[in-house]
C-alpha cells in the first residue's frame, strides 16, 4: 500500500471511530460527515439518528442541506406522496419540512464550509409548497413517484440569514 492510501485508511478509520464513540453513526452514510462538520461549526448537537432531524439547535430539531456546487441551494427530494393534496400539505407542514423550526443551508468548497445560511421553517415551507403543489397531480405517473423541489440561491440570499 502506498503512503497516500495508508494515510487515507488511517484517517478513514479514525473518523469512523470518533463518530462511533460519540454515537453519531456512520460518517460516510449520505451527507453525514457534512452534517457533523456543520453541527460542530454551528455549536449544535449532532442528531443520534440518521432519520429525522440532522441536528439540535437552540430552538430544537433542525434540518441541514448542503451542496458542493458553485452556488448554494437546498434540495428536498424523495418526499413521500400522500393520497390528496390536503393530506400532502399536512404531512409537509407537520411531519416533514415544517417540523423543523430552522433549516440551515451550507455550501462546501473542497473539504471546507464556504458559507452557511439559516432560514425559518415556515419560510422554507412558503417557498416549497407552491413548487410541490405544481408537481403533485402528476408525480405518481413519473418513473420515480416521489416529490421534490429546491430552495434556490436567490431565495436563500433573499429570505435567509447569513451565519458564515
Give a label for each model feature.
Residues 1-164:
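Nucleic-acid endonuclease domains
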